[in-house]
Amino acid sequence: MRIERNGPVALLRMENGKANAISAALLERLDGLIEELGDARAAVITGQGTAFCAGLDLPALVDLDRTTMRGFIRRFEQVILRIFELPIPLIAAVNGHAVAGGCVLALQADVRIGADRDARIGLNETRIGIGLPGPVLETLRWQVPGSSLTPLALEGRLVSPREALQLGLFHDLVPEGDLLDRALKRAADLAALPPAGLRRVKESLRKPVAAAARANATTEGELWLDTWFSPDTQSRLRETVSRLKK
């Protein structure tokens, strides 16, 4: 990952292979980039190639024991909530696939702009047999209309960018070649607003959501681990990893 500056706007580029899968190293780098935002007044996060972020790095995680996996998922939750609570506006420029953890990452942004291209967006955890961590559910409930929760969370549907716009996952959809310019322009417009009031309103909106996400994180985390380590899910995960390695 790397960070660039465009005046008052910081641009965070995820560069972790062609899928931008979420590994322990990517989480630490992302957390470090947050520290580097400095005096930026808005930020844009995007991926590369055909992927914004294709989710958790399953090949690196599937053989972890429960204790180690617990540490990873807790760190994942900490980082996504830190992004959710950023004091400055964050724009997700979703350039391609945003699946499972990748969709979760995009959902932490204030504004999500998608590229109108062939891509899959959504939370397919239930199709593998995994639950959704408590913090993910809290932010999802807050970010999308209630009518979208069944297809996204319960059915685990992966949808096209146009369907993502209809479901409220995206706020805007633009031609692929215009994505970054549009996201940077939206961020610059937000950066031009008086910062004190903007930060106060964002904090007031998001603080109760983050508090609810943390309230039952430990209990919900153990329930999530139960689904991850169930025999059926482990079998499905290993089948998925086998396909990814081909």
Task: List each model region and its residues.
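Conserved CoA-thioester-binding segment of acyl-CoA-metabolizing enzymes
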Residues: 1-48, 67, 81
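Glycine- (often His-adjacent) and acidic-residue-rich active-site loop
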Residues: 39, 47-79, 212
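Glycine-rich phosphate-binding loop at the start of an alpha helix
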Residues: 55, 73, 77, 100, ...
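Structural motif
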Residues: 93-94, 124
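CoA-thioester-processing core
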Residues: 99-153, 182, 186
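Well-ordered beta-strand positions
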Residues: 111, 151, 155-157, 163, ...
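C-terminal long alpha-helix characteristic of the crotonase
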Residues: 114-119, 170-218, 243-246
